[in-house]
């Protein structure tokens, strides 16, 4: 509600309401608002804004303003001057409005703020206490405890928790409190405290009821705290209590106002007990009448809502009944009926205290017999117990209500001496006991009822029950249990219990096989006796136990086993010396039964531990073997029951057996799920003595895994052996399964373990990183030279021809990633050694991703490397000096320990060193670079000349030369080049192989001179010729073909590849070319030998040299020497070779990219001789294995050859057709002969028929899948630029094999037709065009997967393009309408627009050619409606035809429509339209083909040519010929094809018009 605005008469009103300081304070919404002048006089603008907000109607705004005000008061010392008298006057008025808000938060905040002001201002606020204290105390009387309790607590704190001061408030402000109550009760109502414009009637009533209920409670507390309140303020009290506003709260019609109702009941009670009502009869009469009337409001509909208040009503009536011996009942003539009806309804839902209150009312009214004992009270009690029996005992507070009922009912029954009452009580007791609800847990009720009858009575009833008919026992559910509970509770019951025990034993002995099924209570009763302290039963129990082995049967085992287990844990067992014998006898019998072992072992587990141990030692039972056998075959199908509690048969031996059983049966998950129930000792044994941790941790579900780790960690903290084992398992799994998704799990566990067991850090963090690296990387894979920046320099260190173990490499990478992530969590453990290790492994990732068939870019995600960490000196000059002279340690890039380290580690570290130098060289000036060159020259010279130089020294030299080769100081570089070249002159082959090849490797690094002059020669010509002679000598030696020469051969290939790029060298003569070509020819020949060392590198080096030589030949115009043909033959042979070490990786990609470039540079004629071989290899997977790049290369070449050969075949075919046409009329036989020679290859068709992928692309082998699509791509290549006749042959061939529809079905099944997001990202060219080598020979599954998806779309597009109307036939025959709709949506969105655009582009490109020859012809294209219109202007009239391309073309055929005709007959016009349509639907022609036929027919028609008398067209739709056959009789002309068709269909050669014979030669 809003407090805005000022009442017009407010300023003239002298009544201050609740105010005492000159301003009116009121609870209503229209009066008592702060004067604007007062608000404007507030000290600060902040306070003005707060009060302005408090006058708003929005409750959220008020709440925020109160919070701001509270903050100001909290900082009272800073803002004390804000809170002056003007502020308090304004607040006193606003406060009265806020406490009636519907928002409890606002009410509570306003009370808290006022109390804060009282506490902070102290004496300064004293004159305002009369305004504030009544409202505060009203807040403590709210029925909503979330407001009243905090308010009372705040008030108590304000007065230092002094109860005397709080009580004094009620006396000191008695008058003001009564005035407040009077204001609320007498002056205010629903209409005054709520503005009807903004509040509904229900909201207004609820608000007023809440306020007046608080006022009533305030009045009650006023009476409680002030004994003289009625004397000092009698007039005010009378006004308040005479007003009906309070008594209107005695209304229970809707059942929503019970709190206010009960508050008024308390008021009546206080007024009566304090003597106020007896002295004010009018008020008492008014209250009682309202009270009695309210009894009629209670009905069966609202009883559940009002039942909590019923005891208060009854207790009040009982209290008021004391007034003048029941005079209150005379205040209402129908009071008796109202009370009886009230009791009748209220007994249906009694609450705690109800029956006590009923009995209190009965006790107070029985002296004047307000209600008759037998006619009214007795039926009430009887119906109440019946209702309770029907309702059941499981409801809330049912035990308390039941006990309360029987306590009062039994007291009520004692007032009668009549026998019928006693019988009724007995009957109702037994009815309650047999109502189907168990009373065994209701202790107080049992005590109440057990004393009603002697124990013998209960015992006889039990025996009678068991001897009664089964039907009766079924009806009386829980009856015997209730009787038994009362018997054992009743006093002096020993003899009765003894008789009952004998009775039960007799029942068992009489029918041992059926007794427990027949009598449910026998088993529970016997167990109760065994668990009790009834020592007097010892003899009987012992005797019974001794008999059990003779009584037990397989069907009753569970019951007797339960009794025996209970007995073993009871006091009676220790009192019986022969008890153990009885147990042995029992289990001997039990083991003879065909019972599951879990059942018998469950019984043993329940036995007393000492007794169990005695049984285990028994030779007659052999329990150890029994348990061992059980463990071996345990199935974990009992939710781990055997683990629960203190399991007796689990020990260090059996738990191991159980674990091995779980592993053998694949039930480790189930085993782990129940480990939390296992004893710690056994769990430790499991962890230490088995491989459980490595087998289970991270191999089970996430939840189970986390629980397993927590359990293991807890034990690890106290056991270093377990801690180390846990650490090793975490590390092992991180090495195998570490990934960004699993990173957090491994790291979190490692950190928790290190924090709990610090010693385990040495397992995670390597003490000797180089040793760890060497363990996983024992050798350098020679293939690294193909993918690393060091290239052939790799061979300066010892390399291995055998491929490295990629799994070990991957483990090392994952370990480093794990270590890197661990350092993020534990940054204090970062040091240079670990950073160096991680950096080296990060370099290793490059090799892994290039060599692996499944690269992972996420492996590059290292954080703690030299490049990111920043704790290592990366200054270029310092690093160069460090390389020349390694440091002893510190932050140097190269230290002695690294320089002396394992060669594999050193190799990858050198690559890191090279990268660091490469990254920093750009920041180095030329002067600095040239200044360092002298020391580099000295280092290289020393290394080359010193026989003791190591391989590592040479590799460091190579790195420095690669760097300084960029220097502009030519003299020093030339000097080094000359030095290295001189090392090669005149050396013997053995020296070369052993040592000097390293000089050649270093020299190669100085031959990369990208900006050299054209005539520049890197080595002096004389010296170069001397080197050539040495090389020639090496190549002529026998050693040249030995494995030891392999490295030299690679370096020589690299040498000539770089050297022959210089024009100056090429101009020196043919010696360099001849030598290069000879080396190349020999090397290519060696590529064909499987056991050639470094084969994959050799083949790539050969291609590099060939490419360089090819460029040299083209530039110089020189002819290739004698080796030319041999080289090309060997290059072609490379396509067919299967390399054993070949993998679908980056190495393969690089090679086949080069090979494709080389092969495609050759003339296609040179490959024609290989056509059949390529065809056979492509179709025979065994020849190329799983090498997808080889398949890709050969397939793309085959496609080119198919197109090339088809051009010649088409010409040959058409020539033969023409010859055949002129030779014979009936040419059908020879047709078949001609066609059989020009069909699609049968082997190719067989391939696409037999090798259809069985699974969806996502699950199919990607290489096999794309090969299948390539076969189809080859088939469709035959259609490229072919003739109409051959196209029809191909289509018919595919149709006969059923391949067209099958492929359509396959594609639409494989494509996710609803995955529109993917296809929206695909460019239209990727659908309309496809290049087999378009993916740059990427062999990876992800790339091939995406390529397959796009190729499926392209193949569908090509099929649509080439098979014409067969597309529509296939689509229309799809029976699954959902699939049909999905296909249509997909095609319409992604393929049809391309096909339609192609048709329009085709017409656009040739439109000028069509219209230029005929001015009367006009062609119009409408890209919006996808329509083509062609019109002829004839005598100012149009002859027009249209071609409508549907949105889902080609699923629906193009429609040819005759728009308007002129100058020809309708029959001829229709025939033209049909012929035009036939070109598209029958001949798979395009719109342009159809349009050309139509325009030519029109042109010829109006040029005077005669049409065919059969088809009415001038040009034949198929062969485009004029009518050339004439009937000699009627002279009509016919197309040869039309007439031939007529002859075949009619069976003779007569004219279709005149029927005369026509002699016809086709």
Curated annotation (Swiss-Prot):
The keyword Nucleus applies. Disruption phenotype: Formation of detergent-resistant aggregates and inclusions composed of stalled proteins: defects are caused by inability to ubiquitinate and degrade stalled proteins. CAT-tailed protein species tend to aggregate and sequester chaperones and can induce proteotoxic stress. It is found in: Nucleus; Cytoplasm, Cytosol. Pathway: Protein modification; protein ubiquitination. SUPFAM superfamilies: ARM repeat, RING/U-box. GO terms for cellular component: chromosome, telomeric region; cytosol; cytosolic ribosome; nucleus; RQC complex. HEAT repeats lie at residues 41-78, 127-164, 175-217, 262-301, 304-348, 495-532, 555-592, 813-850, 908-945, 997-1037, 1047-1085, 1188-1226, 1263-1298, 1299-1339. GO terms for biological process: chromatin organization; proteasomal protein catabolic process; protein catabolic process; protein ubiquitination; rescue of stalled ribosome; ribosome-associated ubiquitin-dependent protein catabolic process; subtelomeric heterochromatin formation; ubiquitin-dependent protein catabolic process. It is an enzyme of class 2 (transferase). GO terms for molecular function: ribosomal large subunit binding; ubiquitin protein ligase activity; ubiquitin-protein transferase activity; zinc ion binding. Keywords: Cytoplasm, Metal-binding, Nucleus, Repeat, Transferase, Ubl conjugation pathway, Zinc, Zinc-finger. Present with 222 molecules/cell in log phase SD medium. Belongs to the LTN1 family. Component of the ribosome quality control complex (RQC), composed of the E3 ubiquitin ligase RKR1/LTN1, RQC1 and RQC2, as well as CDC48 and its ubiquitin-binding cofactors associated with the 60S ribosomal subunits. This is E3 ubiquitin-protein ligase listerin. The lineage of its organism: Eukaryota, Fungi, Dikarya, Ascomycota, Saccharomycotina.
């Amino acid at each position: 509600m809003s407090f805005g605005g000022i009442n017009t008469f407010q300023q003239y009103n002298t009544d201050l309401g609740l105010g005492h300081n000159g301003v009116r304070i009121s609870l209503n919404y229209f009066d008592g608002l702060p004067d604007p002048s007062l608000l404007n006089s507030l000290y600060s603008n902040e306070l003005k804004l707060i009060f302005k907000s408090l006058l708003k109607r929005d409750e959220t705004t008020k709440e925020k303003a109160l919070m701001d005000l509270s903050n100001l008061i909290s900082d009272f010392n800073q803002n004390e001057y804000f809170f002056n008298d003007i502020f308090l006057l304004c607040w006193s008025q606003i406060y009265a409005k806020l406490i009636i808000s519907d928002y409890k938060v606002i009410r509570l905040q306003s009370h808290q703020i006022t109390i804060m002001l009282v506490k902070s201002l102290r004496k300064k606020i004293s004159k305002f206490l009369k305004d504030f204290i009544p409202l505060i105390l009203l807040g403590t009387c709210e029925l909503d405890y979330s407001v009243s309790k905090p308010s009372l607590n705040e008030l108590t704190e304000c007065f230092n928790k002094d109860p005397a001061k709080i009580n004094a408030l009620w006396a000191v402000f008695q008058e003001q409190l009564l005035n407040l109550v009077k204001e609320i009760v007498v002056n205010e109502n629903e209409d005054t405290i709520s503005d009807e414009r903004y509040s509904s009637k229900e909201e207004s009533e609820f608000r007023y009821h809440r306020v007046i209920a608080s006022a009533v409670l305030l009045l009650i507390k006023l009476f409680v705290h002030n004994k003289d309140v009625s004397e000092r303020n009698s007039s005010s009290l009378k006004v308040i209590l005479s007003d009906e506003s309070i008594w209107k709260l005695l209304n229970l019609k809707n059942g929503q106002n019970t709190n206010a109702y009960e508050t008024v009941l308390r008021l009546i009670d206080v007024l009566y007990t304090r003597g106020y009502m007896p002295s004010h009869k009018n008020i008492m009469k008014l209250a009682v009448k309202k009270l009695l009337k309210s009894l009629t409001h209670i009905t069966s509909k609202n009883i559940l809502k009002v039942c909590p208040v019923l005891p208060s009503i009854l207790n009040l009536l009982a209290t008021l009944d004391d007034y003048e011996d029941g005079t209150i009942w005379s205040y209402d003539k129908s009071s008796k009926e109202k009370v009886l009806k009230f009791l009748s309804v209220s007994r249906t839902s009694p609450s705690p205290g109800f029956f006590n209150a009923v009995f209190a009312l009965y006790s107070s009214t029985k002296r004047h017999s307000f209600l008759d004992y037998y006619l009214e009270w007795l039926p009430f009690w009887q119906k109440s117990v019946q209702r309770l029996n029907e309702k059941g005992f499981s409801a809330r507070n049912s035990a308390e209500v039941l006990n309360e009922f029987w306590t009062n009912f039994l007291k009520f029954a004692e007032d009668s001496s009549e026998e019928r009452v006693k019988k009724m009580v007995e009957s109702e007791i037994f009815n309650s006991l047999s109502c189907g609800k168990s009373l065994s847990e209701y202790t107080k009720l049992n005590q109440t009822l057990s004393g009603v009858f002697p124990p013998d009575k209960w015992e006889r009833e039990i025996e009678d029950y068991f001897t009664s008919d089964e039907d009766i026992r079924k009806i009386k559910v829980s009856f015997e249990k209730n009787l038994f509970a009362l018997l054992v509770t009743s006093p002096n019951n020993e003899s009765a219990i003894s008789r009952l025990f004998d009775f039960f034993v007799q029942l068992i002995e009489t029918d041992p096989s059926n007794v427990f099924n027949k009598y449910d209570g026998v088993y529970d009763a016997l167990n109760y006796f065994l668990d009790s302290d009834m020592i007097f039963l010892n003899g009987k129990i012992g005797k019974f136990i001794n008999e059990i082995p003779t009584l037990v049967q397989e069907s009753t085992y569970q019951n007797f086993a339960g009794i025996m287990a209970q007995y073993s844990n009871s006091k009676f067992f220790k009192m019986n010396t022969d008890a153990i014998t009885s147990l042995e006898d029992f289990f001997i019998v039990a083991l003879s039964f065909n019972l599951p072992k879990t059942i018998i072992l469950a019984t043993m587990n329940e036995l007393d531990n000492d007794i169990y141990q005695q049984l285990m030692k028994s030779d007659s039972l052999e329990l150890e073997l029994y348990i061992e056998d059980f463990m071996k075959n345990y199935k974990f199908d009992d939710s781990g029951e055997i683990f629960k509690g203190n399991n007796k048969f689990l020990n260090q031996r059996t738990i191991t057996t159980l674990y091995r059983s779980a592993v053998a049966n694949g039930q480790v998950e189930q085993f782990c799920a129940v480990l939390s129930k296992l004893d710690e000792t056994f769990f430790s044994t499991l962890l230490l003595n088995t491989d459980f941790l490595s087998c289970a941790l991270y191999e089970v579900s996430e939840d189970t895994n986390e629980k397993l780790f927590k359990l293991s960690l807890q034990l690890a903290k106290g056991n270093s052996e377990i801690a180390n084992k846990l650490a090793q398992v975490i590390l092992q799994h991180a090495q195998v399964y570490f990934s960004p998704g699993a990173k957090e799990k491994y790291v979190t566990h490692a950190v928790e373990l290190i924090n709990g067991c610090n010693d385990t850090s040495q397992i995670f963090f390597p003490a000797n990183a180089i040793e760890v690296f060497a363990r996983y990387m024992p050798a350098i894979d020679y293939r690294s030279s193909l993918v690393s920046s060091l290239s052939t320099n790799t061979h300066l260190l010892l390399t291995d021809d055998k491929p490295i173990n990629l799994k070990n490499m991957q483990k090392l990478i994952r370990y480093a990633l794990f270590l890197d992530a661990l350092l993020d969590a534990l940054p204090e453990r970062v040091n240079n050694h670990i950073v160096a290790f991680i950096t080296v492994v990060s370099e290793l990732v490059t090799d892994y991703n290039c060599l692996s068939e499944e690269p992972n870019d996420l492996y590059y995600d290292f954080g703690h490397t030299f490049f990111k960490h920043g704790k290592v000196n990366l200054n270029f000059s310092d690093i160069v000096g460090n390389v020349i002279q390694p440091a002893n340690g510190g932050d140097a890039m190269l230290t002695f320990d690294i320089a002396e380290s394992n060669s594999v580690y050193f190799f990858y570290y050198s690559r890191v060193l090279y990268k660091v130098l490469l990254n920093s060289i750009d920041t180095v000036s030329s002067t600095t670079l040239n200044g360092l060159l002298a020391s580099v020259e000295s280092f290289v010279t020393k290394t080359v000349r010193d026989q003791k130089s190591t391989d590592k020294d040479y590799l460091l030299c190579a790195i420095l030369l690669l760097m300084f080769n960029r220097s502009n100081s030519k003299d020093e570089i030339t000097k080094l080049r000359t030095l290295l070249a001189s090392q090669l002159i005149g050396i013997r082959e053995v020296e070369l192989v052993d040592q000097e090849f390293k000089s050649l490797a270093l020299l190669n690094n100085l031959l990369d001179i990208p900006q050299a002059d054209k005539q520049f020669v890197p080595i002096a010509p004389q010296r170069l010729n001397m080197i050539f002679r040495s090389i020639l000598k090496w190549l002529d030696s026998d050693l040249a073909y030995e494995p030891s020469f392999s490295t030299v051969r690679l370096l020589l290939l690299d040498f000539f590849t770089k050297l022959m790029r210089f024009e100056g060298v090429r101009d020196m003569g043919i010696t360099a070319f001849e030598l290069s070509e000879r080396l190349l020819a020999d090397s290519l020949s060696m590529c064909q030998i499987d056991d050639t060392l470094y084969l994959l590198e050799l083949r790539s080096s050969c291609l590099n040299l060939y490419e360089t030589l090819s460029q040299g030949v083209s530039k110089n115009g020189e002819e290739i020497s004698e080796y030319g043909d041999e080289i090309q033959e060997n290059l072609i042979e490379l396509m067919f070779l299967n390399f054993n070490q070949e993998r679908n990786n980056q190495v393969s990609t690089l090679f086949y990219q080069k090979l494709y470039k080389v092969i495609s540079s050759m003339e296609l004629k040179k490959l024609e001789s290989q056509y059949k071989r390529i065809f056979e290899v492509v179709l025979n997977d065994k020849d190329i294995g799983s090498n997808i790049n080889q398949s890709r290369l050969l397939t793309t070449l085959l496609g080119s050859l198919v197109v090339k050969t088809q051009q010649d075949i088409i010409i040959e075919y058409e020539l033969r057709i023409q010859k055949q046409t002129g030779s014979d009329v009936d040419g059908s036989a020879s047709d078949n002969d001609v066609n059989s020679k020009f069909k699609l290859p049968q082997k190719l068709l067989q391939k696409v028929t037999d090798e259809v992928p069985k699974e969806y692309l996502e699950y199919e082998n990607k290489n096999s899948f794309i090969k299948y699509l390539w076969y189809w791509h080859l088939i469709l290549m035959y259609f490229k630029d072919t003739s109409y006749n051959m196209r029809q042959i191909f289509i018919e061939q595919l149709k006969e094999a059923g391949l067209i529809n099958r492929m359509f079905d396959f594609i639409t099944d494989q494509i996710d037709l609803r995955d529109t997001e993917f296809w929206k990202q695909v460019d239209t060219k990727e659908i309309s065009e496809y290049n087999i080598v378009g993916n740059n020979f990427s062999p990876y599954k992800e790339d091939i997967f995406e390529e397959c998806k796009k190729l499926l779309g392209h193949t569908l597009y090509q099929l649509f393009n080439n098979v014409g109307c067969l597309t529509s036939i296939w689509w229309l025959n799809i029976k699954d309408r959902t699939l049909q709709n999905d296909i249509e949506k997909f095609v319409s969105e992604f393929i049809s627009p391309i096909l339609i655009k192609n048709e329009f582009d085709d017409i656009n490109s040739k439109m000028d050619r069509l219209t230029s020859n005929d001015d009367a012809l006009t062609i119009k294209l409408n890209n919006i409606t996808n329509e083509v219109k062609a019109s002829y202007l004839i005598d100012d009239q149009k002859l027009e035809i249209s071609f409508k391309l549907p949105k889902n073309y080609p699923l629906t055929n193009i429609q040819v429509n005759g728009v308007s005709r002129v100058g020809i007959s309708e029959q001829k016009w229709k025939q033209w339209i049909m012929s035009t349509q036939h070109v598209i639907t029958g001949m798979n022609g395009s719109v342009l083909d159809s349009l050309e036929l139509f325009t030519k027919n029109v042109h010829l028609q109006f040029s005077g040519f005669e049409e065919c008398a059969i088809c009415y067209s001038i040009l034949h739709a198929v062969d485009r010929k004029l009518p050339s056959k004439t009937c000699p009789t009627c002279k009509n002309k016919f197309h040869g094809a039309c007439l031939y068709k007529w002859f075949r269909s009619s069976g003779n050669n007569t004219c279709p018009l005149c029927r005369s014979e026509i002699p016809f030669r086709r």
